[in-house]
Design a protein with these regions (language model features):
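Short, well-ordered, mixed-charge alpha-helical segments that flank or form enzyme active sites
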Residues: 14-18, 36-40, 81-85
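Conserved small/polar residues in nucleotide/adenosyl-binding loops
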Residues: 1-5
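Acidic-glycine-rich active-site phosphate/pyrophosphate-binding loop
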Residues: 153-167
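Accessory alpha-helical/coil subdomains and C-terminal extensions
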Residues: 8-10, 20, 27, 47-157
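Short gly/pro/ser/thr-enriched loop/turn and capping motifs at secondary-structure boundaries
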Residues: 15, 34-39, 105-107, 135
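Acidic/polar active-site rim loop that often engages polyanionic ligands
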Residues: 31-44, 67-68, 93
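Catalytic, metal-anchored helix/loop core of enzyme active sites in primary metabolism
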Residues: 141, 167-176
Length: 176
């Protein structure tokens, strides 16, 4: 006898769709598969490790350029609703500062830290930012770009902006 069943691999939207199927009597199993790593009760979702490795590889390349030119790079990664990518990639790459929506970000403290690092002889600086944060009252979605300009103005460190965005969704699958 043939029985219909669904194995749903994805995030919140996929699981909402699977729930709809179960309401019609179709059995479903959900496997967390999202680079955002924001599925409740899941340590790490399918795709997160690949996204992390992609970000780390790209930031390593940016850091090489930052080091040779004594530069700062504000790196924006996906994470509008959850800052796991920015947080873990920031830690993995030794970022000077990390901005995620879950933790209040003090821009002045970040700038002071960059100045102190510059004065101590550091040659490269990475500021990792999750997309869409922190939004001001007007809902400014270009915060990361503007942060890069303010860092350059206030520290004297040449600062570039890199939005990694959807390229982080690609890459050869990896597993930690």
């Amino acid at each position: 006898m043939y029985k219909r069943q669904i194995v749903a691999i994805g995030g919140d939207g996929t699981f909402r769709g699977a729930t709809d199927f179960t309401n019609y009597g179709v059995p479903c199993i959900g496997l967390p598969g999202t680079i955002d790593n924001d599925i409740t009760s899941t340590d790490e979702s399918i795709g997160f490790d690949t996204a992390m490795n992609t970000v780390v590889e790209m930031v390593d390349r940016l850091r090489d350029t930052c080091d040779s030119h004594r530069r700062c790079n504000v790196v924006e990664v996906m994470g509008r609703a959850a800052g796991y990518i920015a947080l873990e990639a920031g830690i993995a790459t030794g970022a000077s500062a990390i901005a995620v929506k879950e933790i209040p970000f003090d821009e002045d403290a970040c700038i002071a830290k960059l100045i102190a690092q510059k004065e101590s002889g550091k040659r490269n600086f990475i500021v990792m930012v999750a997309e869409g944060i922190p939004l001001d009252a007007a809902g400014d979605k270009e915060y990361s770009e503007k942060l890069a300009k303010r860092i350059q103005e206030k520290t004297g460190i040449e600062t570039k902006f890199a939005r990694l965005a959807h390229v982080v969704r690609g890459g050869s699958p990896t597993l930690r």
